[in-house]
């Protein structure tokens, strides 16, 4: 019987093996702030590289940008964030704990096995539901709540030497707006024709009321977003194209179908400007959570920026001889969230013999933080084994380990997800060959050192 996969086990491994540390740890930390350690930064970078490879580099349609975090405040007025980017905040009067009202209801429903979606409900409807169902504070058990009020999620700061309303700016709550305001620049300089997309990876900031579940929801996070511009009327076929593309990208990196589901938003959930929205959800140990939002945003964003900036962001289509404001399909993915999902997907405990259980992270080789570990059987072989390490390290992120028994070293590498271990033994001095052990099957093959480059050439592609 397989051991239960829990967040407690995954978080413990992440902290102990250098994937993720509590932020500001020696000062007692900061609520829900996390630092990526040596293995975590490699894993997350590999996730970002995999996204960039398929969505930008190999795509015939898309190009990339890297926009500033700090933008003219009018950008956020135009986008609607200043006026409407808020969460419903509710306080428990007895213990003074603050909650996000919709999440309070969702958690209550999950605990009581109630199937009911709160997306799209107004504050008055949320409040009425809390009263009707007798929803209680998870901190103290009280049902004595304040009224719901709006809480703007943007971090505000000041630019320059004065702290007044004229110098107010915001940390961006999403990367998308940097793409929209650069639509004309990118189209002009790249001479792209519709349909085409602009993607970027970057940090965003949201002053979440109830962050939690490790790195799933944090106030500082990284996004991988694509804005794909197309002709009006063809948006729904492109929406389906990108929805399928995103889903297949996850499958190609070893996510199991049974741990993924596509949830189409009901009409009452949709934003007023949206033709369609689908969430790709992943089954975390704590339950289903949104990974990817794919939205047909129509021409809303470009038109908003046209109105507020007075700049013309329309496009003249040389094929149809028409001028129009393009529609936009937005697949928006959280880099931290999907990295956590890959970590949860990869975690496994396998009984290799009676009473002998190994912990192994079954990452797709393209995502594995360490690709190859070089393990000399004896420290006396270190000088020759190091030459193998140096040769491979030019192409792959490798680890060299000569401490402990070979069995313990294999287990250490299994636990951090290293796909291949190379053992350099005393025979290697004579036959110029090494033993390669596969992480998942634990099977071993003997390979000439001079053939290693060819052996690994296609092992890390997807």
UniProtKB/Swiss-Prot annotation:
Protein localization: Cytoplasm
GO biological process: glycyl-tRNA aminoacylation
Pfam families given in the database record: HGTP_anticodon, tRNA-synt_2b
Major site of localization recorded for this protein: cytoplasm
Annotated keywords: Aminoacyl-tRNA synthetase, ATP-binding, Cytoplasm, Ligase, Nucleotide-binding, Protein biosynthesis
Binding site for ATP: 206-208, 216-221, 290-291, 334-337
CDD domains linked to this entry: GlyRS-like_core, GlyRS_anticodon
Catalytic function, reaction form: tRNA(Gly) + glycine + ATP = glycyl-tRNA(Gly) + AMP + diphosphate
Annotated residues for binding of substrate: 100, 174, 221-225, 330-334
EC number: 6.1.1.14
InterPro entries: aa-tRNA-synt_IIb (IPR002314), aa-tRNA-synth_II (IPR006195), aa-tRNA-synth_II/BPL/LPL (IPR045864), Anticodon-bd (IPR004154), Anticodon-bd_dom_sf (IPR036621), Gly-tRNA_synthase/POLG2 (IPR027031), Gly_tRNA_ligase_bac (IPR022961), GlyRS-like_core (IPR033731)
GO MF assignments: ATP binding; catalytic activity, acting on a protein; glycine-tRNA ligase activity; protein dimerization activity; transferase activity
GO cellular component: cytoplasm
Assembly with partners or alone: Homodimer.
Biological function: Catalyzes the attachment of glycine to tRNA(Gly).
Family in the record: Belongs to the class-II aminoacyl-tRNA synthetase family.
Name of the protein: Glycine--tRNA ligase
Annotated source species: Ruminiclostridium cellulolyticum (strain ATCC 35319 / DSM 5812 / JCM 6584 / H10)
């Amino acid at each position: 019987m397989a051991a239960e996969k829990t967040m407690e086990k995954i978080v413990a491994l992440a902290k102990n093996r250098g994937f993720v540390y509590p932020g500001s740890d020696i000062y007692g930390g900061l609520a829900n702030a996390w630092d990526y350690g040596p293995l975590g930064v490699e894993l997350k970078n590999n996730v970002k590289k995999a996204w960039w490879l398929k969505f930008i580099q190999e795509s015939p349609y898309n190009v990339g940008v890297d926009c500033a975090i700090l933008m003219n405040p009018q950008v956020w007025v135009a986008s609607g964030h200043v006026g409407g980017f808020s969460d419903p905040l509710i306080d428990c009067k007895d213990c003074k704990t603050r909650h996000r009202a919709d999440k309070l209801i969702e958690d209550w429903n999950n605990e009581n096995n109630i199937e009911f979606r709160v997306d799209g409900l107004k504050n008055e409807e949320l409040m009425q539901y809390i009263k009707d169902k007798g929803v209680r504070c998870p901190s103290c058990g009280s049902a004595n709540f304040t009224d719901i009020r709006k809480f703007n999620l943007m971090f505000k700061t000041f630019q320059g030497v004065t702290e007044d309303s004229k110098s107010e700016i915001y940390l961006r709550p999403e990367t998308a707006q940097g793409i929209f305001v650069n639509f004309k620049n990118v189209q002009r300089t790249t001479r792209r024709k519709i349909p085409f997309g602009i993607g970027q990876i970057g940090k965003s900031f949201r002053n979440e009321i109830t962050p939690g579940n490790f790195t799933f929801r944090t106030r500082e996070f990284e996004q991988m977003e694509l804005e794909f511009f197309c002709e009006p009327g063809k948006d729904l076929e492109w929406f389906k194209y990108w929805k399928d593309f995103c889903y297949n990208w996850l499958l190609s990196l070893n996510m199991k179908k049974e741990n993924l589901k596509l949830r189409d938003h009901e009409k009452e959930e949709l934003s007023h400007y949206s033709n369609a929205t689908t969430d790709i959800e992943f089954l975390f140990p704590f339950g289903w959570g949104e990974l990817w939002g794919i939205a047909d945003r129509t021409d809303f964003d470009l038109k908003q920026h046209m109105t507020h900036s007075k700049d013309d962001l329309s496009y003249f289509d040389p094929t149809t001889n028409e001028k129009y404001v393009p529609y936009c399909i937005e697949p928006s993915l959280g880099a931290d969230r999907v990295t956590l999902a890959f970590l949860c997907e990869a975690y496994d405990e396998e009984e290799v013999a009676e009473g002998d259980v190994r912990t192994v992270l079954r990452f797709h080789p393209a995502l594995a933080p360490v690709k190859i570990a070089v393990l000399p059987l004896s420290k006396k072989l270190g000088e020759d084994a190091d030459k193998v390490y140096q040769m491979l390290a030019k192409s792959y992120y490798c680890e060299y380990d000569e401490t402990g028994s070979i069995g313990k070293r294999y287990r250490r590498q299994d636990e951090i997800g290293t796909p291949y271990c190379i053992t350099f033994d005393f025979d290697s001095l004579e036959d110029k060959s090494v033993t390669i052990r596969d992480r998942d099957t634990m099977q071993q093959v003997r390979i000439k050192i001079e053939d290693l480059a060819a052996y690994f050439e296609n092992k890390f592609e997807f």
